[in-house]
């Protein structure tokens, strides 16, 4: 998705946790740490983190969103990382979601529908 085509929104209390996407076979485990989401869109998430993730790293993230029943598992890539000027967490991190659809390395259309619904709800509040 193009960056500019996705409206950013924030939902207080939203958290993210992640694991590295396995390259071939095998499994990886989610970190025990979870981090606050600053804002999100249909295209990605901006969050605070203590780990310096590598730009280009492939992740699988779970996002816990207050007021929703699901905790979507989303395939993403790290797009940027910078030092956090605040004292709370060491880094600010931006990830981009893989495209939506059927097939390997694609995110489900249900996730896209959920994000669209959350975006609509945030429009009504703002």
Question: Where on the chain are the PLM-derived regions?
Answer:
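N-terminal helix initiation/capping motif
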Residues: 1-40, 113-126
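A short macromolecule-binding patch
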Residues: 94, 102-111
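Short strand-loop-strand
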Residues: 21-63, 94
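Short, solvent-exposed secondary-structure boundary/capping segments
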Residues: 48-49, 84-97
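Short beta-strand-centered aromatic/proline hotspots
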Residues: 35, 73-82
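Short conserved beta-strand and strand-loop elements enriched in small hydrophobics
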Residues: 14-18, 58-71
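Short coil-to-beta-strand transition motifs
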Residues: 9-10, 29-32, 65-75
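Short, conserved beta-turn/loop elements at beta-strand boundaries and strand-helix junctions
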Residues: 20, 42, 81-87
């Amino acid at each position: 998705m193009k960056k500019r085509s996705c409206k950013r929104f924030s939902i207080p209390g939203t958290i993210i946790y992640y694991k590295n996407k396995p390259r071939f076979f095998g499994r990886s485990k989610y970190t025990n740490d979870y981090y606050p989401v600053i804002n999100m869109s249909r295209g990605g998430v901006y969050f605070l983190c203590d780990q310096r993730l590598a730009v280009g790293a492939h992740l699988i993230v779970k996002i816990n969103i207050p007021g929703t029943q699901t905790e979507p598992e989303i395939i993403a890539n790290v797009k940027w990382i910078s030092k956090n000027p605040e004292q709370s967490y060491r880094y600010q991190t931006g990830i981009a979601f893989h495209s939506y659809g059927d097939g390997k390395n694609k995110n489900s259309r249900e996730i896209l529908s959920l994000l669209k619904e959350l975006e609509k709800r945030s429009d009504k509040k703002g």
